[in-house]
């Protein structure tokens, strides 16, 4: 993982309700981490990659950064997409105890990082 991303993520973690995260370049996964024992790490990483890829296809933002969310029965996937094509995907439990303000801070902070 690049030092700037590693330092950035370390400054925000842990976040209540965060089950997994992934940082993805347009053609490669930089890091994928499953933070709960209730999910399989390989399946979780694959799902996050697919959500990011579908988001890139459906919501191509070009020169602008974007944030989007896919909602499932038990989880939500929040994605921050930077103008350089790097994305941060957060798999968050779908319950009222999640620290959503913290999740939003991470997403916006990732978009605002000067370099990845």
Give each language-model segment a name.
Residues 1-25, 30-116:
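Non-catalytic interaction/Regulatory regions outside core domains
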């Amino acid at each position: 993982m690049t030092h700037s991303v590693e330092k950035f993520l370390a400054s925000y973690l842990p976040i209540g309700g965060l089950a997994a995260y992934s940082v993805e370049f347009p053609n490669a996964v930089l890091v994928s981490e499953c933070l709960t024992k209730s999910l399989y790490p390989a399946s979780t990483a694959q799902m996050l990659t697919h959500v990011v890829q579908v988001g890139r296809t459906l919501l191509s933002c070009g020169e602008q950064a974007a944030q989007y969310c896919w909602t499932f029965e038990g989880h939500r996937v929040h994605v921050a997409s930077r103008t350089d094509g790097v994305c941060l995907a957060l798999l968050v439990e779908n319950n009222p105890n999640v620290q959503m303000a913290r999740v939003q801070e991470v997403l916006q902070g990732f978009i605002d990082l000067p370099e990845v």
